[in-house]
């Protein structure tokens, strides 16, 4: 690629791949135990109209360097945590791909143990795909981000720079900035004065804001594509205001030298009465324009009974609404996060998707984008909560094998005593950014899938203790560590949260690294949290913008997508 940010990282990944390919490992043996498919065969499969899940089990940071367009990243270290949600049907056609180093073989063994019966491996991984003349992509959620850029080209979505927006505000003009990101991103950093309205909520909540028609509405996100789809959502809805997307979002705002707010919780109110009815009618009009289908509970049951097709039932309401009561057969997703990040919610292309929203507005608007984004069998469920029992709390994934884990536990105060007496070694399997922000003093960062490597660096003590942020991942790591080390292993009860709750010491930084910190693909907006005005941040942000702008052209060359974007006039 032309931008140096991704090119340098990709070159390093290829060098590591060539080095590891020279070593015969158990991964290579496992690789040969499963059917192999060639790059040309996989290319044919992508367009044969049948369901397919292309899975890349490398760590996110490695995956982000180079991968297939349709590959979904399910890291080997966390495979159990996501697999049943991401691939709900055990007979799904699954193709594993990696960098040629053999991670696919290890993942194939696990998938077989979990009951998946139709697993094959791309021979040679993405390097073989590239050598066959096919496009390889860098970055995360590429298909969704490409869709955002694609629709902008076709709809000619209006945009404004941060400087142009600030000039309007300085002149005293009426300007309303709507931040289209989820609330957890908004509270972390936001443009001063902006109101948080996630994209799927824009039409739902807009009329309740009582915006005068002469107000300029500017939609922002962290970068580009969510603001673009957000702005185009309001335009598609036919609101009378002039609407524009902020070019570059919070990253460009920072680069322009403008301050951000932190810890803000401003959000648009929930609609009621006439405003709710107006939102619903608007959403219905848009859905009709794009051929969105609404199905009954009876039709949903028929889909659930179909053993030959995959089905994803996704609840689009806010986190609080979901926790208050949700269908037991649903998973959680949030609007445009779904449209531009289906790789985080569903791994099977050509599957059926049913969207849930008690008011239907959010589901109808989201579905209007999904059917354009090559998810043609996307439906909205009518009366989704009628006659069904509801679960409460957060989504609880089924984790294969977790019910068989009975690890010894240690409380935070007891662990602190052992650490002071130098009788324990702590291994932290939280993500590397969380570890950097704060961890138990002396704890070693490690990635679960690399415990063999980690144990060669970690000083041995009489007790090994595993901690982290995800209880299931901590338990799985404890089980693996006991098997590999042959030593007594326990897990910290309550994990890192319990340690903090006990007001015990916390250390920041990359203190003890037992493995690489490539579990996260560090995107520029994350860099901005630490060094917002550094030359490195600005260089990375500009490279990111360049990368996004290149995506439509690269998709044209790849000829792998089937976006169905048409003008509003063509649909009337």
Regions found by a protein language model. Give the residues of each.
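Rhodanese-like catalytic fold shared by cysteine-dependent sulfurtransferases
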Residues: 2, 6, 28-53, 60-176, ...
């Amino acid at each position: 690629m032309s931008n140096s940010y991704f090119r340098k990282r990709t070159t390093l990944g290829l060098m590591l791949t060539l080095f590891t390919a020279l070593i015969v490992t158990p991964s290579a043996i496992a690789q040969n135990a499963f059917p192999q498919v060639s790059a040309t065969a996989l290319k044919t499969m992508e367009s044969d109209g049948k369901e397919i899940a292309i899975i890349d089990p490398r760590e996110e940071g490695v995956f982000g360097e180079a991968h297939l367009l349709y590959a979904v990243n399910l890291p080997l270290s966390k495979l159990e945590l996501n697999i049943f949600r991401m691939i709900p049907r055990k007979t799904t056609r699954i193709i594993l791909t990696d960098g040629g180093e053999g991670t696919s073989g290890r993942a194939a063994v696990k998938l077989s143990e979990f009951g998946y019966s139709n697993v094959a491996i791309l021979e040679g991984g993405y390097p073989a795909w590239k050598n066959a003349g096919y496009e390889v992509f860098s970055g995360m959620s590429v298909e969704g981000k490409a869709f955002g850029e694609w629709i902008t080209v076709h709809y000619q979505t209006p945009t404004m720079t941060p400087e142009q927006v600030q000039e309007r505000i300085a002149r005293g003009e009426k300007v309303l900035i709507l931040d289209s990101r989820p609330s957890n991103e908004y509270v972390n950093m936001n443009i001063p004065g902006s109101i948080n309205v996630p994209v799927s909520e824009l039409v739902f909540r807009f009329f309740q804001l009582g915006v005068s028609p002469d107000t300029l509405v500017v939609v922002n996100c962290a970068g580009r594509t969510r603001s673009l789809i957000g702005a185009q959502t309001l335009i598609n809805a036919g609101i009378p205001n002039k609407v524009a997307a902020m070019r570059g979002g919070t990253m460009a705002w920072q680069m322009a030298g403008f301050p951000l707010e932190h810890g803000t919780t401003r959000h648009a109110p929930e609609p009621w009465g006439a405003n709710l009815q107006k939102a619903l009618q608007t959403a219905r009009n848009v859905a009709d324009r794009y051929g969105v289908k609404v199905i009954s509970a009876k039709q949903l049951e028929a889909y659930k009974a179909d053993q030959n097709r995959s089905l994803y039932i996704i609840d689009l309401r806010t986190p609080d609404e979901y926790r208050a009561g949700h269908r037991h057969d649903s998973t959680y997703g949030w609007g445009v996060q779904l449209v531009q990040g289906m790789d985080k919610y569903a791994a099977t292309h050509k599957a059926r998707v049913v969207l849930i929203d008690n008011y239907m507005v959010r589901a109808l608007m989201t579905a209007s984008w999904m059917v354009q984004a090559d998810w043609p069998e996307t439906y909205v469920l009518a009366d989704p909560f009628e006659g069904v029992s509801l679960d409460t709390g957060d989504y609880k994934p089924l984790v294969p094998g977790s019910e068989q884990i009975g690890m010894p536990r240690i409380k935070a105060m007891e662990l602190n005593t052992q650490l002071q007496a130098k009788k324990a070694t702590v291994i932290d399997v939280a993500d590397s950014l969380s570890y950097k922000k704060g961890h138990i003093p002396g704890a070693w960062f490690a990635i679960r899938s690399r415990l063999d490597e980690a144990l060669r660096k970690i000083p041995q003590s009489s007790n090994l203790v595993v901690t982290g942020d995800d209880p299931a991942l901590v338990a799985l790591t404890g089980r693996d560590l006991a098997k590999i080390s042959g030593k007594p292993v326990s897990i910290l009860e309550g994990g890192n949260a319990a340690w903090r709750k006990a007001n015990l010491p916390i250390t920041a930084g990359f203190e003890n690294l037992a493995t690489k910190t490539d579990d996260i693909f560090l995107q520029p907006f994350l860099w901005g949290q630490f060094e917002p005005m550094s030359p490195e941040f600005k260089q990375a942000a500009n490279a990111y913008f360049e990368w996004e702008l290149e995506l439509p052209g690269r998709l044209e060359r790849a000829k792998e997508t089937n976006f169905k974007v048409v003008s509003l006039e063509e649909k009337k």
